[in-house]
Amino acid sequence: MTPFELLEPGSLAEAIKLLDPEDSDIRPIAGGTALMLMMKAGVFRPRCLVSLRKLPPELSRISAGSGGELAIGAMCPLSRVERSADVARVAPVIPRAMLRLSNVRVRNVATVGGCLAHGDPHMDLPPILIALGAQVSAVHPKGERRIAVEDLFAGYFETILQKNELISELRIPPQGGARTAYCKVTTGSAEDWPAVGVAVSVEQEGSVLKSARIVVSAATEKAMRLKGAEQALAGGAVDDQAFKRAGDAAADEVECISDVRGSAPYKRELVRVFVRRALRQALDGGGVAH
């Protein structure tokens, strides 16, 4: 690994000042679980890392509002999210998914903000957050902006964040009567990266499906909603035929990529099956399935 300088600012504003948008050899580092592996492999060779570990504690907090919304600081470790009673109450699908996310050593170090800013399409959290309608706050030299998580990812390991822009907070809106589930397929161990991840959020009104959000990840270049599959469900009856229709629409719509975890045609068939399975899982009570 190439030697580098480590800077440790004490505030978010100071950290942003240290990030030169014209210098790609300066990178921020939060937990570092992904970045350090890439540096050891020689994928990245930064000459300077701006550590975010000494930022104020409010950037690691979890707070629930009276209206049912949830705010999670960008520096909050995934293990704290996993154990949070507030998260379990507002979005129980998240702590359930965390139990199958890598291993406890990684979850103790990896952060919410780093998980999103890294832009890795194989991660479990982004598709779930998209299904939940979550947003991030991103701070830059001229102020702050809100970005829907579904708009955050630009491509394979790419986000729309500027080089001198940092995620400060994640916000999950009140979920009302929506029920959410996440299913993934791993071709290796349970700790392995998934070949396909599917997150869904559905709201039922009587025997009719009022709304649906269907998100696929890992099989694609970025976590993304399948709006054609959502439209195939909206306003229809809640039955296995509707779930099959949505699965077929998802398989037709999705653009899968081939990699070591499977070919694009194989992953397309996984999407077909697991969209159907995730919808049933959500309406049966939510949760995580494999």
Residue ranges, per PLM feature:
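C-terminal structural segment of proteins
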Residues: 1-290
